[in-house]
């Protein structure tokens, strides 16, 4: 139960920060210049983005394949597994479309907004970002029903696959409709696209993302009240406990998995990681929103925002893997069995010995 609470709280905090970030992203995209100036830091930002996208695609692929193999070999699928698999697929497509925009340098052409390729990629990127908000909303709603024996919503605790797929279909249709509106706004020339119309369209795009955020907040409040009644108030975390928690992160892949690890310690580790993400997103939101309000056409500002915005899709699979004991222990077992430095040195010595013979 505590593992599901960690996943839900992780989705709730990062959902809100990403929602604020997307609002400023829409403003900057509406006022994006027709030709992007090659600043001295542009190549540096590209160099930082490629490893980020590669790492995020690899981590989400591992998470997606693990759930696929679990379904194939066990012939059973939980609702939470379907949602996490869908979220991983969305993040893969999100990072892939953003990588195409960076690699092909669509922003460097003079007729960017008239290019069909640019519109298609921007449309897919916008749809994936909207789906990355709707999917954690469903995840939080399912995890909020934590006491089926008391509440009348017990029948919603284990929804069927048809209900989950129906929600996915509705989310895809809704976000594709929003993406069409977004691309139609980009199609207008700058003369016809005034600041008032841009703000109205940006607020409309922000409004459809506000409803999932509100749902997540209500479910989080409900779950927090229930946990308070069951477990009582949480202990206050002191400085020494924070230091021990950080050390737990560093020693996660250097020590064998212990079956008696305290769930409270794992929860506090996830909270510390979430605090760092929230701080990063709030700094980026302040930076990007100030540029969107003042209508500053700074390409370096846009590319910095792209890197920070995609950090959600790149790092969130690590949080899901760490929150899932089964995946984490499997990866840890593979590490100690095949990839740990002592094992690699032993294999190297055996190969050297066989070569000498």
Curated annotation (Swiss-Prot):
Parts of the chain on the Cytoplasmic side: 25-52, 103-130, 185-269, 322-357
MF GO annotations: pheromone receptor activity
Positions annotated as glycosylated: 297
Example of a GO biological process term: response to pheromone
Membrane topology category: Multi-pass membrane protein
UniProt KW Cell membrane keyword: yes
Keyword tags: Cell membrane, G-protein coupled receptor, Glycoprotein, Membrane, Pheromone response, Receptor, Transducer, Transmembrane, Transmembrane helix
Keyword Transmembrane helix annotated: yes
Gene Ontology CC annotations of this record: plasma membrane
Pfam families according to UniProt: V1R
Membrane-spanning parts: 4-24, 53-73, 82-102, 131-151, 164-184, 270-290, 301-321
CDD domains, per the entry: 7tm_V1R_pheromone (cd13949)
Extracellular membrane side: 1-3, 74-81, 152-163, 291-300
Protein localization: Cell membrane
Similarity-based family: Belongs to the G-protein coupled receptor 1 family.
Note: The chimpanzee and orangutan orthologous proteins do not exist, their genes are pseudogenes.
Protein's job: Putative pheromone receptor.
Protein name: Vomeronasal type-1 receptor 5
